[in-house]
Every structure is written in structure tokens, then in C-alpha cells.
């Protein structure tokens, strides 16, 4: 098992502790496995990739049969059981047919009678929360499968939810829980920086026909240059998105824009401040389109900003949200980009006179770099979100379950994201932030007839 863990650690940086814990829990096939392991964490934390690689190495180096499936693909219990049996008992071929959990357990018991000594079985189920929608006995049986089949078998469940969400009235067997926390900023930069050589080779291939640019690229694109770029990139993106695959994809897209003035010879590769001024606008435009996969036409690359804005407008106009959800989205944007101390002046009609002071006048003379709409979103509480929502909505609406469910819909669509307290929504300690940009919310405002700029401190 030590050899397996050692081979996986270079492939999954910053996950050494999780790999070591998983190795200690599983051990060798000659040792007794735990009956079930629950691996959970947010998307982009490496659950699926790590488990798949771990099972693959166990299958190669040990006397273990493995099965890995995605519960989303299994729309019936029968399909899921047949996929599992096909992986765990490949010698049987088409003879294996199961209709329910009882048949599945019986087939595995037959495997116990014919299995090789010290043979182990590992089953991994991705998106395990979907098991709750299947037959009522599926999840309890999977958790006790080792006991029922008399096999050295372990079921690894993968999900984004904590295991408390799985409990029902009849109860479930105890399970070993392993949490994969989100990467911090330094870890994210280390992971993104680990593919430097691959990114550099792609750039060299891209400029292979242009000798002048190829020479500049070979000299300028060093590991320090790439790390400086990632540092600037994460200063914009890290608060809004911590999904590593998504960040990796967006970072590669924006690198060519960052490199452009260096290739033209107008900016030195070590002049980070000028490179930041060049890349700041495109990075903020890309931030409004993260997860959306909006591509620029190749023939219009030069008109970068105009194309991005046009794509955002089209997306905002075609976004089919309920009427109140659009106002909730506007309220979330206002809460993310206005200071809480300004709420009374912005949303209360009779807030009293405000004296003009020189300090206030100077503070309002903001440059583009200091405007809150370009600095990125700030977190806010649900109480503040609802207070702004009721302030900007002309009609009176009761606080119903339907209204609160629309907040979770916006989170599911990645228009809002949780910063903290995701499990404590009803207690009021949860904090969110708005992930959309100014151009997007202005178009939403036009659809519902609301002037967003009028309620933004940056434009007052």
C-alpha cells in the first residue's frame, strides 16, 4: 500500500494527507477492509480523480477487483447492479442478470465461494446522493454489503453533501467519513503551476511558424513568469471560484492575452505592474463568464471587450428565471458591490440629509481600478439580501418557501456562491457572494425595468 500511495502523491499535489488516510483505511487485500467509506467535499477538490486512480493502482498491484460508476448514469437500480456485477465478476459474461438487491447479494455470495484467497473487492459510487432516489433498500444494503456477502469488500461513496443528509427514519449503518477540504490560495497556485511545462509546450507549438515570437516566447515564458501570472489571475478569480478544473481552463485561455504585449515588444516580461494593467480588464470580463463556456469567434479576436459584452447581453436576455428570482439576483449584486453602511442611504426613502465633506468628495473621485464593481464581489448575509430585495421590489410579497428556494436555484446555476455557513442557511449565519458581472446585471435590470446603476455607489 505504501508503494501505491507513493505513486499517487506526485499526481495529486496537496492531497498527501487524504491519500495516506485512504491507504491506511484500505490497506492490503490480505487485511480486512472497512465495510464503507464516505468521501465528500465540494466540486473540484479531486474526489473522483483521486478515487479512480487509487482503484486503478489497487487493481494493478494487488489481488483486487474494482468497480467505479456514476450514479447519475444509473437511472434504474437494475442498471447500476448490472454494471457493478459486470466489473466484479467479468468471467460470468452475459450469464449475470439481476433485477433487485436480493439477486445482487446472491450473485456476490457465489463469488465468495469461488474467490481466490486474499482477494479483495472495491466499489466506488460517484454522486452517491442519487442513491437516495433509488429503491429504499439500495443504500442500506450497500453499506452492509461486506457483512451480507462474506467478502472482503469495501464500498466507497463520493458526494458533495455531508453524510447527515443521507439519514432516514430507519437509520443507516456506521460509515467512515473522509472530508476533502477546498484548496487554499497557495495550494491552488501550486496545482495550477504544476502543469507549467505542458502550457509552455503548447505556446511554443502555437508560435512555431513565427520565428520572432517563438524566440521571445522561449526567453520570456519561464516558471517565475508563469507563477506571477497565476498570482494575478487568482487575485481576481479565487474569491469567486475555487473549482480547480474550471480555474485551470480559464487560466490557460487568458494566458495568451497576458503574453501579447510581451510578444509585441511593448512591455518587458518582468514589468508586472504594466502587465497587470493590460490583463485586468480581460480577467474581469472572463470572471463574468466562468462556467458558461462562451467562446469568441476567431476572426474577431481583436475586438475582445465588445464581443465579451455582446455574449453577456445575449446570455442575460435568454436566461429564463422567475420574476422574483431576477430581483433576488439584482439584490445580490447590489449587496456584493455596495458597502453595508450605505444601505440606509440607498434604499430608505427618508434617510435624512447627508453633509458634504471634503473627505467624502475625495473618496467618491474613484479611479476605475478602485471601483467596487471591478474589484470583485464581497460577501453578504441572507438577511441583508432579503432586506434589499424587499426595498427594490415595489409590490409586497410574503416570505414563502418558494421565494427561499429561488436562492438555492441561483446557487445551483452558479450565479451566487456560498462563502461560508452553507449548512446553516436557516440560522442566518450563511454568507454568499454574487458571481455575475456589471454588464450581466444591467441586462437583467432592463428585462424587469429596474435601473441598477441608480443603486450602485460607484455611479453616484
Swiss-Prot record:
UniProt KW ATP-binding keyword: yes
Superkingdom as given in the UniProt entry: Eukaryota
Family per record: Belongs to the ORC5 family.
CDD domains the UniProt entry points to: AAA
Keywords for the protein's UniProt record, in alphabetical order: ATP-binding, DNA replication, Nucleotide-binding, Nucleus
Name this polypeptide is given: Origin recognition complex subunit 5
GO cellular component, one term: nuclear origin of replication recognition complex
GO molecular function: ATP binding; ATP hydrolysis activity; DNA replication origin binding; ribonucleoprotein complex binding
Function: Component of the origin recognition complex (ORC) that binds origins of replication. DNA-binding is ATP-dependent, however specific DNA sequences that define origins of replication have not been identified so far. ORC is required to assemble the pre-replication complex necessary to initiate DNA replication.
Species name: Drosophila melanogaster
Complex formation: ORC is composed of six subunits.
Binding of ATP, residues: 41-48
Subcellular location: Nucleus
Gene Ontology biological process: DNA replication; DNA replication initiation; DNA-templated DNA replication; mitotic chromosome condensation; mitotic spindle organization
Amino acid at each position: 500500500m505504501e508503494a501505491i500511495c507513493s505513486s499517487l502523491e506526485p499526481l495529486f499535489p496537496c492531497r498527501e494527507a487524504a491519500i495516506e488516510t485512504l491507504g491506511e483505511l484500505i490497506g492490503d487485500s490480505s487485511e480486512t477492509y472497512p465495510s464503507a467509506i464516505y468521501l465528500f467535499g465540494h466540486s473540484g477538490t479531486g474526489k473522483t480523480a483521486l478515487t479512480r486512480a487509487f482503484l486503478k493502482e489497487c487493481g494493478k498491484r494487488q489481488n483486487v477487483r474494482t468497480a467505479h460508476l456514476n450514479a447519475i448514469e444509473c437511472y434504474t437500480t437494475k442498471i447500476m447492479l448490472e454494471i457493478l456485477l459486470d466489473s466484479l465478476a467479468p468471467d460470468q459474461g452475459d450469464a449475470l442478470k439481476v433485477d433487485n438487491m436480493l439477486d445482487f447479494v446472491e450473485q456476490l455470495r457465489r463469488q465468495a465461494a469461488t474467490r481466490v484467497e486474499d482477494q479483495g473487492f472495491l466499489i466506488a459510487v460517484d454522486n452517491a446522493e442519487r442513491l437516495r432516489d433509488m429503491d429504499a433498500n439500495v443504500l442500506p444494503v450497500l453499506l452492509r454489503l461486506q457483512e451480507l456477502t462474506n467478502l472482503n469488500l469495501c464500498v466507497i461513496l463520493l458526494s458533495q453533501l455531508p453524510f447527515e443528509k443521507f439519514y432516514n427514519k430507519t437509520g443507516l449503518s456506521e460509515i467512515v467519513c473522509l472530508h476533502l477540504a477546498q484548496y487554499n490560495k497557495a495550494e491552488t497556485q501550486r496545482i495550477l503551476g504544476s502543469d507549467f511545462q505542458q502550457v509552455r509546450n503548447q505556446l511554443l507549438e502555437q508560435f512555431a511558424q513565427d520565428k520572432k515570437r517563438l524566440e521571445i516566447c522561449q526567453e520570456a515564458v519561464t516558471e517565475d513568469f508563469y507563477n506571477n501570472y497565476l498570482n494575478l489571475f487568482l487575485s481576481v478569480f479565487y474569491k469567486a471560484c475555487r473549482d480547480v478544473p474550471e480555474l485551470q481552463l480559464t487560466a490557460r485561455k487568458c494566458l495568451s492575452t497576458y503574453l501579447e504585449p510581451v510578444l509585441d515588444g511593448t512591455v518587458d516580461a518582468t514589468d508586472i505592474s504594466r502587465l497587470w494593467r493590460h490583463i485586468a480588464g480581460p480577467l474581469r470580463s472572463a470572471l463574468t463568464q466562468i462556467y458558461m463556456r462562451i467562446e469568441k469567434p476567431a476572426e474577431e479576436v481583436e475586438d475582445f471587450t465588445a464581443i465579451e459584452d455582446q455574449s453577456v447581453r445575449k446570455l442575460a436576455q435568454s436566461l429564463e428565471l422567475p420574476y422574483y428570482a431576477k430581483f433576488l439576483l439584482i439584490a445580490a449584486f447590489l449587496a456584493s458591490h455596495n458597502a453595508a453602511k450605505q444601505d440606509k442611504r440607498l434604499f430608505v426613502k427618508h434617510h435624512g440629509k447627508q453633509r458634504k465633506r471634503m473627505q467624502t468628495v475625495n473618496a467618491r473621485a474613484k479611479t476605475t481600478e478602485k471601483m467596487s464593481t471591478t474589484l470583485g464581489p464581497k460577501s453578504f448575509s441572507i438577511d441583508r439580501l432579503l432586506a434589499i430585495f424587499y426595498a427594490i421590489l415595489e409590490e409586497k410579497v410574503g416570505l414563502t418557501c418558494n421565494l427561499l428556494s429561488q436562492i438555492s436555484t441561483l446557487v445551483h446555476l452558479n450565479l451566487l456562491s456560498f462563502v461560508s455557513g452553507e449548512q446553516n442557511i436557516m440560522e442566518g449565519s450563511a454568507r454568499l457572494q454574487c458571481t455575475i458581472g456589471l454588464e450581466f446585471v444591467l441586462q437583467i435590470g432592463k428585462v424587469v425595468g429596474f435601473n441598477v446603476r441608480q443603486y450602485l455607489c460607484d455611479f453616484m
